Each structure stands twice: as structure tokens, then as C-alpha cells.
Amino acid sequence: MRIDPSTLNLKEKVVFINRVAKVVKGGRNFRFSALVVVGDENGHVGVGMGKAVEIPEAIRKGIEDAKKHLVEVAMVDTTVPHAIQGEFGRGRVLIMPATEGTGVIAGGPVRAVLELAGLKDVRAKSLGSNNPKNMVGATINGLSRLRTAEQIAKLRGKSVEEILG
């Protein structure tokens, strides 16, 4: 099920800009790639990559791409329902719930994704690759696989009390 970005009030954040060079006979041709995260700070977040000769154009393309890849994040108040490990390439991110008032404890690219998803109290630990693209991808992977107790109970045809014990 695709999420319609036009119905959401999306904010964007540029996580990483990379300059790449193609060496040709006449010298070097430079291009830029931009890794962009968009989110409504209310349970929807997406990530996109844009490439172009100019930085603003790369960012614009990244935002467009991110809007096409929005995911819904299961939340319990201001945190995640349970701990989960997301994986993308060799990047692994462990996302853990935190008590109210803790804030977002996460490094660099992971923090941008968690904040734009609308999580206020969450802890995250980056394991494996610290490449921004892999870290952001792993975070999105983890967040998209989160399920609340109500969702699991509905899937299994049981009550929430039976699931939680």
C-alpha cells in the first residue's frame, strides 16, 4: 500500500552529499549525489537518493525519490513498540524503546530518520558499516518491520492480553 505524499506535511533533511569524479581525457567530470530523508514527524518517513551535476538538483531529485518510498512506522506514544534490528547491505542498526523524556539517542544519519519519523524517545546503536546510505537503509528497514501488540493480535486472531501474557 503506497502512502500519498501530497496528503502529508513533509519535512526534509539532507543526510549526506557526495562528490564523485569521472576521469575523462580532458580532465575530471564532477557530479553530486544526495541522500535525503523526508518525514511528517507523525509515523511516516522515507529515504531517497538523487544524482546530478549541481547540488540543488541532486537534493530535489532525492526529495522526489524519498516521497516515492515512504513507509509507515508503528509507534507506541513517543517510542517504538519493541526492540528491532534493521539490516541493509552490511549496515545494521539496533533500535530500542526508551522511557519518556529520554530523547533521541542515536548517531548521525540514524538520528535524522528517527526524528523525521516522529519518534521522541528512542535509543539506537549502529552495528557494522557506518556508511550513511547503509545506516539510513538499515534504520528504514527496522522501522518498517515494527508491529504493535494490537497488530500482532489481529494477525493471530487473539486478544492483546493473550499476546502480552
UniProtKB/Swiss-Prot annotation:
It comes from Clostridium novyi (strain NT). One of its GO terms (cellular component) is small ribosomal subunit. The gene is rpsE. InterPro entries: Ribosomal_Su5_D2-typ_SF (IPR020568), Ribosomal_uS5 (IPR000851), Ribosomal_uS5_bac-type (IPR005712), Ribosomal_uS5_C (IPR005324), Ribosomal_uS5_N (IPR013810), Ribosomal_uS5_N_CS (IPR018192), Ribsml_uS5_D2-typ_fold_subgr (IPR014721). With S4 and S12 plays an important role in translational accuracy. Located at the back of the 30S subunit body where it stabilizes the conformation of the head with respect to the body. Keywords: Ribonucleoprotein, Ribosomal protein, RNA-binding, rRNA-binding. One of its GO terms (molecular function) is structural constituent of ribosome. Part of the 30S ribosomal subunit. Contacts proteins S4 and S8. Residues 10-73 form the S5 DRBM domain. NCBIfam families: rpsE_bact. The N-terminal domain interacts with the head of the 30S subunit; the C-terminal domain interacts with the body and contacts protein S4. The interaction surface between S4 and S5 is involved in control of translational fidelity. Gene3D superfamilies: 3.30.160.20, 3.30.230.10. GO terms for biological process: translation. HAMAP family: Ribosomal_uS5_B. This is Small ribosomal subunit protein uS5. Belongs to the universal ribosomal protein uS5 family.
